[in-house]
Amino acid sequence: MSRIKQSIKVDGRLCWTLFDTGARNTYVIPSVAAALKVSVPTATVRTALGGSVKETNRATVLNAQIEGHPITTHALVIDEIGKDENGTPIEILFGALAMQQWGIRPVPDEERLDLSHYPEEFIEF
């Protein structure tokens, strides 16, 4: 499991983001979702996150810029993700599925992201 923290841009605003390969899905807090179109899934989604079970009935499409690279991915909206070890609130938890989709690899020894596998185009079969 690898974790990297850095800011990404959502609608021109920098958002503190945790890239976590131990999390399957991507999550955003309501202040981030306010800049995005939120939809209501047909059922409540429950997820174990940060030692507790959180519920949501809101989802969004996260459109963001990571180190200048545009990304789009599905995200669940939850009231609170948690804080990092410095006490800074995490606004976005970027999960493993989205990292795989966008070719993002955490490099924990250097505390950075490797975007050398970012797809310039998608090839579908």
Residue ranges and their predicted role:
Residues 4-46, 75, 93-95:
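Aspartyl protease active-site motif detector
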